[in-house]
Amino acid sequence: MQGDSSPSPTTTSSPLIRPINRNVIHRICSGQVILDLSSAVKELVENSLDAGATSIEINLRDYGEDYFQVIDNGCGISPTNFKVLALKHHTSKLEDFTDLLNLTTYGFRGEALSSLCALGNLTVETRTKNEPVATLLTFDHSGLLTAEKKTARQIGTTVTVRKLFSNLPVRSKEFKRNIRKEYGKLVSLLNAYALIAKGVRFVCSNTTGKNPKSVVLNTQGRGSLKDNIITVFGISTFTSLQPVSICVSEDCRVEGFLSKPGQGTGRNLADRQYFFINGRPVDMPKVSKLVNELYKDTSSRKYPVTILDFIVPGGACDLNVTPDKRKVFFSDETSVIGSLREGLNEIYSSSNASYIVNRFEENSEQPDKAGVSSFQKKSNLLSEGIVLDVSSKTRLGEAIEKENPSLREVEIDNSSPMEKFKFEIKACGTKKGEGSLSVHDVTHLDKTPSKGLPQLNVTEKVTDASKDLSSRSSFAQSTLNTFVTMGKRKHENISTILSETPVLRNQTSSYRVEKSKFEVRALASRCLVEGDQLDDMVISKEDMTPSERDSELGNRISPGTQADNVERHEREHEKPIRFEEPTSDNTLTKGDVERVSEDNPRCSQPLRSVATVLDSPAQSTGPKMFSTLEFSFQNLRTRRLERLSRLQSTGYVSKCMNTPQPKKCFAAATLELSQPDDEERKARALAAATSELERLFRKEDFRRMQVLGQFNLGFIIAKLERDLFIVDQHAADEKFNFEHLARSTVLNQQPLLQPLNLELSPEEEVTVLMHMDIIRENGFLLEENPSAPPGKHFRLRAIPYSKNITFGVEDLKDLISTLGDNHGECSVASSYKTSKTDSICPSRVRAMLASRACRSSVMIGDPLRKNEMQKIVEHLADLESPWNCPHGRPTMRHLVDLTTLLTLPDDDNVNDDDDDDATISLA
């Protein structure tokens, strides 16, 4: 053709085949080895691990765009290897191809450093144990050594790469644009090595601009996979995992951790799934798909946390498939996947589910003791005639003599708005045999009135009943401005009696003080006042004039006894209690209690008596106002006996005394190990805590559940032994109807008047030939025409329908795609019909059945009788997978462990024989 300047094939000779320039080869091949930032750092980290390093530090500048370096404490590089260190295909780990069968190192090709030289500026700083100083090596882009320089460094190696991809313009621009994404991939990859490398400490940090170094990964180099998981992901993630050990064959096994079956253990993304072969991180998409689909059968749409290490002999797999060594071939993949599926089925069986135990959320004020037990013990003291001699002189216990001074905070808790107080109590010792005062002794008060404020009166008392001292916290009952009635509770009921005095244990109130104005010297630093001891203490300042108060006080104070005691204690005890004066007239109401935040367990020891003296450095400028204390122990004893009689008449006390009392709840879950380095102890404690904090629920347990009632016209409250569960009535009934429809629904087949020609890809045609029986079971009838052109070998002759819903070509292609994704023998997708066969259905078929089941189920807002609720719960026991409705909603949740509603005091001095004194009724 005229005007065509292109050479004719007949007149032009074929081009000559010439060798490619070495530099061009180097750059082309290097770009295939180092694909991104994560692959570059991966090669350096693997070199450090092969060198036996126990500490690896990765430092990046501007997320690796400027430079990145890997620092280790490995064996270092000997001077004889300096010149060949970065040459292509030079390695010390492989001599013959057969060595691949027994490979124990991460690297074996000798391409990493050579490729990094071609794509960036490489420097290496290294020292062995035989060298006195380190050497800094500089290489050019071809891998040749250009400079050596002596420098100071510990034994090990530091590899620095600057300006990665700088000599590849397109790759460099793409690298800079996605640098944050590349950095995220790198951190995820380092997590994999930090998990599997036992005894190796990893630190990864990044520095941006003039900002300080930011550490994103810091492990401790523990010696077990369990400890590495806790370090990298935290204890909360580890508690949701369970160990896995599956024997695939005689010489192959799988070990690691998987998310526990049940709700609340998975993740919304599959971002924490790590697979290893003999400790090498690899990609295993088929295993990942298998685990995900089995897990979703029990936990809705979540993805499990997966950490699995395949321990196989060297000849059972091929690692030399891709340049990054992430793709692996098994010699017998089918048997490996099949054996793994059988082992995972035992873990993610649809007949079991794990529920996180919900504790009873107590208020910030926790009961000091088990109410029934405390009440019974105090009542027994009174009923048996054990009466304390309140007028006798008693001595302080020896416990005060040995106690070291310590600071304590006494906090006032008031339900009504009032000013804030802060008391600073300093412990003081006393000599044995000194300082005895009667309980009836009235404290001396000398205070200067300010702005018409009433006087501050404090009276502290101690009971000698040793069994009431089981709590580690001390209670102080004090009064401000006036004495408070604690016993005139006209409308008290059983619940009030059983929770006498709440206490904040080991917590600090928000009440704070800046300085103190009054100084109180105390005989002792610890005191205990039970609420019942002040039942009859009723003093009102409106009922007495100041002169009457002075007269009453004068009658009660004997100058020959009380004044001497006061003077002696002022001389001997110099560690004060300071109060801050309120800024307004404040009066404690009924139930106001001082709470002592006490960390010293010795403070739970009983004291004999306490007298408190208040003294003010200021001189009195006005009339003194006092309140006297009227108290009769006989009246208190009578009141307590009457209360006990009322409870006995109702049968409440006898029922509690005849039922064993539960142990302290969640003791193992809150236990602090005294020997954190004891692995066996930690393992036992972790197992005990796990058993307390989760419940393994089996399908058969639905038949044993007792329905208690309906909540909010939408949920069923049921009890199983000591646990309460809440069941979603709509989701539970919907799942029952869904599985019933899946078993009973038959898809009818509608022949087409004119067959439809299908346009399928070659891969789809192969899938159709492999799974023709499953396609036919779903109602599609295909006709094959081998003489047709490629892509048109099949024609559709019939389509399925159900009632008014018809399925067509798009549903057939959806079914073919599902079958292709499951790769035949690896198929684990659940069937909409029954678990006996692995038949798969189009997504629209499942959606149709789910919609019908939803519309025919009990709705939220429907009132149900008890027998109807029991029927819904029992139906769940007959289902294949009763844990989620077809739309993913959980059918049941753990509500509360009933034993947490009543707990024993946290006291080591309580005998086990006392456990039978009280209980809680779970009925």
Swiss-Prot record:
PROSITE patterns documented for this protein: DNA_MISMATCH_REPAIR_1
Skewed-composition ranges (Basic and acidic residues): 543-553, 565-581, 591-601
Primary localization: nucleus
GO molecular function, one term: ATP-dependent DNA damage sensor activity
Pfam families according to UniProt: DNA_mis_repair, HATPase_c_3, MutL_C
Role: Required for DNA mismatch repair (MMR), correcting base-base mismatches and insertion-deletion loops (IDLs) resulting from DNA replication, DNA damage or from recombination events between non-identical sequences during meiosis. Component of the MutLalpha heterodimer that forms a ternary complex with the MutS heterodimers, which initially recognize the DNA mismatches. This complex is thought to be responsible for directing the downstream MMR events, including strand discrimination, excision, and resynthesis.
Region named Disordered: 543-603
Gene3D superfamilies given in the database record: 3.30.230.10, Histidine kinase-like ATPase, C-terminal domain, MutL, C-terminal domain, dimerisation subdomain, MutL, C-terminal domain, regulatory subdomain
Name of encoding gene: PMS1
Tissue expression notes: Expressed at very low levels in mature leaves. Detected in rapidly dividing tissues.
Quaternary organization: Heterodimer of MLH1 and PMS1, called MutLalpha, which is the major MMR MutL activity correcting base-base mismatches as well as IDLs. The heterodimer binds double strand DNA independently of a mismatch with positive cooperativity and has more than one DNA binding site. Forms a ternary complex with either the MSH2-MSH6 (MutSalpha) or the MSH2-MSH3 heterodimer (MutSbeta), which recognize and bind to mismatch DNA. Ternary complex formation is promoted by ATP binding.
Naturally occurring in which organism (per UniProt): Arabidopsis thaliana
Matches recorded under NCBIfam families: mutl (TIGR00585)
GO cellular component term of the entry, any: nucleus
SUPFAM superfamilies registered for this protein in UniProt: ATPase domain of HSP90 chaperone/DNA topoisomerase II/histidine kinase (SSF55874), DNA mismatch repair protein MutL (SSF118116), Ribosomal protein S5 domain 2-like (SSF54211)
Keyword terms: DNA damage, DNA repair, Nucleus
Subcellular location: Nucleus
Protein name: DNA mismatch repair protein PMS1
Keyword Transferase set for record: no
GO biological process, one term: seed development
Top-level lineage group: Eukaryota
Effects seen without this gene: Reduced fertility. Increased homeologous recombination frequency.
Family to which the UniProt record says this protein belongs: Belongs to the DNA mismatch repair MutL/HexB family.
